[in-house]
């Protein structure tokens, strides 16, 4: 970076010297003689000295800016424009205002008024030009940035010499924070109560959450049961009150015997309704009509009792008939289930085609299959080679199955090969039979051939 900046500064100096020579020649040719006379050699020397000092100050300011700036491309592009503008401003200022203070900075070329070039390029104020806002931790004096260290190569340390007290204070503050913490920002975690009574064994630990849930569930169930019981007790009390009121009214009207019978019947009906199913209770409730004030005559009481008895008998009959019909239907269903075979129905017309049969027996297969049959074991299929028959049977009992089409073809081959097997005696008998048949055929052919030759010889002799 230093070599680049030096080369650029040399190029700028050359340009400036060229521009000075041109400006002097132009002044000599185009400027008026009055102006030439006013400018003396001493003033020229002063201007040269001022220019030299301004150049040195500009270089130092540029270097400090380059250290602060993050994006390199923008800096490299904007630096020549700045240098050119500063050089032109130097010329204009040197030509126009010779009496200027040495420390005053030269003004740049006037730009378009709405152009915010300088505002955007002021890197110390703009956080988006590589410099973070002043309050952030990036500009912390205790944390010098990597780029400033890298570019300065030790020269950036002079920035923090004045702030050494602040840096030390910040360091001490960090140490305190690390030791004590910040309770205002991050509170301490709650201390766990030490339980010495519980001794945990490996694999026997059950989380406390599950126990809590179970306890909650039990508590809820007990609450629900208690609520249900309270509701039932309330209902019973209300029914008893109604029955007592009805019995008292009937006792006032009717005789003592009739009142006792009505109260007993009402209590019996309540017990029956509680024992019976829900739908019977509903029917009984539906049958009951809204209570009206009974007349003083005993005839109406007797009629109402008779009606109640009839309705009870009808309800009992309907219940019995429904239960009998349900039991009959259940018996029918069980009988039908017993008659039908459980499981998938067999395919109708599952005749075997030529595709289902394999090829003929290979040499040695017949003998092997005969040995399996003699031992009473199942014959393995070609897809099961490498496994013993016991292993295959175990696999099939567990549930391992071949693919359907392969299974069908293998079964067909197995059946055909089992049918092809013969015992040793049968083989001998077959061999003898085939030999006899062959000899008969051969003898027949030979006799026919002999007869033909004999007939031909006799025909020649006759001639």
Curated annotation (Swiss-Prot):
It comes from the Eukaryota. Residues 78-98, 241-267 have a biased composition (Low complexity). Residues 1-358 are annotated as: Disordered. One of its GO terms (molecular function) is chromatin binding. GO terms for cellular component: catalytic step 2 spliceosome; nucleus. The keyword Phosphoprotein applies. Pfam families: Nkap_C (PF06047). InterPro entries: NKAP, NKAP_C. Keywords: Nucleus, Phosphoprotein, Tumor suppressor. GO terms for biological process: mRNA splicing, via spliceosome; regulation of gene expression. The modification Phosphoserine is found at residues 136, 189, 191. The modification Phosphothreonine is found at residue 195. Residues 15-29, 39-71, 107-125, 279-288, 330-340 have a biased composition (Basic and acidic residues). Tumor suppressor involved in maintaining genome integrity. Influences gene expression and mRNA splicing. PANTHER family: NF-KAPPA B ACTIVATING PROTEIN, NFKB ACTIVATING PROTEIN LIKE. This is NF-kappa-B-activating protein. The lineage of its organism: Eukaryota, Metazoa, Ecdysozoa, Arthropoda, Hexapoda. The gene is Nkap.
């Amino acid at each position: 970076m230093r070599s680049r900046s030096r080369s650029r500064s040399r190029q700028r100096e050359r340009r400036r010297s060229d521009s000075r020579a041109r400006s002097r020649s132009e002044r000599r040719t185009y400027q008026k003689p009055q102006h030439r006379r006013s400018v003396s050699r001493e003033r020229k020397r002063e201007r040269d000295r001022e220019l030299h000092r301004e150049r040195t100050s500009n270089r130092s300011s540029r270097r400090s800016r380059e250290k602060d700036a993050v994006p390199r491309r923008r800096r490299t592009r904007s630096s020549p424009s700045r240098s050119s503008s500063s050089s032109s401003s130097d010329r204009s200022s040197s030509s126009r205002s010779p009496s200027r203070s040495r420390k005053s900075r030269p003004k740049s070329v006037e730009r378009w008024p709405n152009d915010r070039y300088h505002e955007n390029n002021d890197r110390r104020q703009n956080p988006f030009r590589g410099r973070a806002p002043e309050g952030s931790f990036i500009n912390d004096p205790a944390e010098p940035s990597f780029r400033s260290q890298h570019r300065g190569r030790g020269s950036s340390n002079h920035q923090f010499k004045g702030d050494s007290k602040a840096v030390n204070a910040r360091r001490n503050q960090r140490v305190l924070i690390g030791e004590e913490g910040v309770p205002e920002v991050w509170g301490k975690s709650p201390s766990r109560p030490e339980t010495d009574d519980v001794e945990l064994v490996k694999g026997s630990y059950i989380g406390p959450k599950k126990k809590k849930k179970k306890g909650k569930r039990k508590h809820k169930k007990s609450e629900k049961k208690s609520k249900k019981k309270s509701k039932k007790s309330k209902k019973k009390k209300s029914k008893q009150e109604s029955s007592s009121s009805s019995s008292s009214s009937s006792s006032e009207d009717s005789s003592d015997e009739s009142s006792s019978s009505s109260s007993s019947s009402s209590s019996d009906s309540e017990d029956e309704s509680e024992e019976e199913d829900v739908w019977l209770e509903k029917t009984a409730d539906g049958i009951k009509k809204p209570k009206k004030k009974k007349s003083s005559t005993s005839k109406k009481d007797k009629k109402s009792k008779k009606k109640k008895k009839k309705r009870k008998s009808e309800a009992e009959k309907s219940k019995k008939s429904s239960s009998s019909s349900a039991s009959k239907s259940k018996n029918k269903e069980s009988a039908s289930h017993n008659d039908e075979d459980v499981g998938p129905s067999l395919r109708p017309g599952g005749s075997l085609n030529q595709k289902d049969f394999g090829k003929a027996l290979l040499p040695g297969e017949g003998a092997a299959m005969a040995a399996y049959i003699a031992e009473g074991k199942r014959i393995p299929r070609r897809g099961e080679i490498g496994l013993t028959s016991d292993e295959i049977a175990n696999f099939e009992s567990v549930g391992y199955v071949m693919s359907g089409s392969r299974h069908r073809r293998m079964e067909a081959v197995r059946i055909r090969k089992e049918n092809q097997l013969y015992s040793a005696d049968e083989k001998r008998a077959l061999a003898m039979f085939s030999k006899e048949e062959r000899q008969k055929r051969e003898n027949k052919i030979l006799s026919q051939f002999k007869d033909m030759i004999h007939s031909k010889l006799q025909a020649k002799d006759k001639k």
